[in-house]
Amino acid sequence: MSPSIVFTGGGTAGHVTPNIALIKEFRKEGWNVEYIGSVSGIEKEMIEPLDIPFHGVSSGKLRRYFSLKNLLDPFKIVLGIIQSSLLFYKIKPDVVFSKGGFVAFPVVVGAWLNRIPVVAHESDMSPGLANRLSFPFVNKICLTFDAGKKYFKRQDKIEVTGTPIRQQLLTGNRMKGLELCGFNSSKPCLLVVGGSLGAGSINSCIRSALKQLTSEFQVIHLCGKGKLDSSLVGVEGYCQFEYANEELADLFAASSVVISRAGANSLYEILALGKPHILIPISSQVSRGDQIQNARYFQGLGISVVIQDELLKADVLLQAVQDVMRKKDEIDNKIKALKIESATDKIVAIIKEQAHVQTPRIV
């Protein structure tokens, strides 16, 4: 009988894309793979093309602020634990891999109740609330950054691995990317990535600065679902998409500079591709500040140019783009020195070890 694994994680693309990299590896090796996510989260849409069983369970939001909805969330989480536990009793996987996000906690507890080993992964400098709550119930947690170790008591559960990267991102074709946008090689390209849900402040700033940007660059703009601007269709040197999936590798390959939020998974991929970049982290007023931590760390290394979201204006962005282009060679060398590579093989080995289908590693 083939070994089996259940993946969980969702809420944003950052809690799903590393799972996709791992899912493809396990399927290649003949494992039975299933996914547990929230009923209406982005993970269902992203996992669907992989053609694996998807199970939706109830989940709370794990908010850090007061809301009347917080009163209902404990009941949603308990229901999610019950649903997950029943699913695991039926599926009986050898191991569970959790990428975090609010759906992950009830799934992790459901696995623990069924005595199924759990491996979790944390992408950010400091762990999210779901992974903090899940930590007592996991066998191992893989961290992207060594700085995250201080937030956990049981150091024997921790492995610093990096982040899994979708293999296809590393095989992009520049000319295909240019053709997809109707561009040519006469001007460098800027790739603007606002995240899976889009970013209103980035979208507005790019569009207000479009005339100046397109005088020197060709602009590829991933603006988020439902956030295309019909008035800009056909503007020379500007191509907008709601979201890019299979074509993302080619769009990256076509780009000289990337403008992005500072989510750890996106940032790790940008670094692995060796792209000079500008980071615009989500404000701490609407997040736990993890993106600000990520951005500051790489800004301190002289690698990332950072603009705070509340200071984002057309003139500030244009100056940042000029700064990156002026220091491009220096930034290229600093990124190369990091030797960033995909953690897929490392994490696959840890998962197999916990599932007892591989001889324990010597670490």
UniProtKB/Swiss-Prot annotation:
Its EC number is 2.4.1.227. Signal peptide: none annotated. CDD domains: GT28_MurG. GO terms for molecular function: UDP-N-acetyl-D-glucosamine:N-acetylmuramoyl-L-alanyl-D-glutamyl-meso-2,6-diaminopimelyl-D-alanyl-D-alanine-diphosphoundecaprenol 4-beta-N-acetylglucosaminlytransferase activity; undecaprenyldiphospho-muramoylpentapeptide beta-N-acetylglucosaminyltransferase activity. It is found in: Cell inner membrane. It is a peripheral membrane protein. Keywords: Cell cycle, Cell division, Cell inner membrane, Cell membrane, Cell shape, Cell wall biogenesis/degradation, Glycosyltransferase, Membrane, Peptidoglycan synthesis, Transferase. It is an enzyme of class 2 (transferase). It catalyses: di-trans,octa-cis-undecaprenyl diphospho-N-acetyl-alpha-D-muramoyl-L-alanyl-D-glutamyl-meso-2,6-diaminopimeloyl-D-alanyl-D-alanine + UDP-N-acetyl-alpha-D-glucosamine = di-trans,octa-cis-undecaprenyl diphospho-[N-acetyl-alpha-D-glucosaminyl-(1->4)]-N-acetyl-alpha-D-muramoyl-L-alanyl-D-glutamyl-meso-2,6-diaminopimeloyl-D-alanyl-D-alanine + UDP + H(+). GO terms for cellular component: plasma membrane. Pathway: Cell wall biogenesis; peptidoglycan biosynthesis. Gene3D superfamilies: Glycogen Phosphorylase B. InterPro entries: GlcNAc_MurG, Glyco_trans_28_C, GlycoTrans_28_N. Belongs to the glycosyltransferase 28 family. MurG subfamily. Cell wall formation. Catalyzes the transfer of a GlcNAc subunit on undecaprenyl-pyrophosphoryl-MurNAc-pentapeptide (lipid intermediate I) to form undecaprenyl-pyrophosphoryl-MurNAc-(pentapeptide)GlcNAc (lipid intermediate II). HAMAP family: MurG. PANTHER family: UDP-N-ACETYLGLUCOSAMINE--N-ACETYLMURAMYL-(PENTAPEPTIDE) PYROPHOSPHORYL-UNDECAPRENOL N-ACETYLGLUCOSAMINE TRANSFERASE (PTHR21015:SF27), UDP-N-ACETYLGLUCOSAMINE--N-ACETYLMURAMYL-(PENTAPEPTIDE) PYROPHOSPHORYL-UNDECAPRENOL N-ACETYLGLUCOSAMINE TRANSFERASE 1 (PTHR21015). This is UDP-N-acetylglucosamine--N-acetylmuramyl-(pentapeptide) pyrophosphoryl-undecaprenol N-acetylglucosamine transferase. It comes from Legionella pneumophila subsp. pneumophila (strain Philadelphia 1 / ATCC 33152 / DSM 7513).
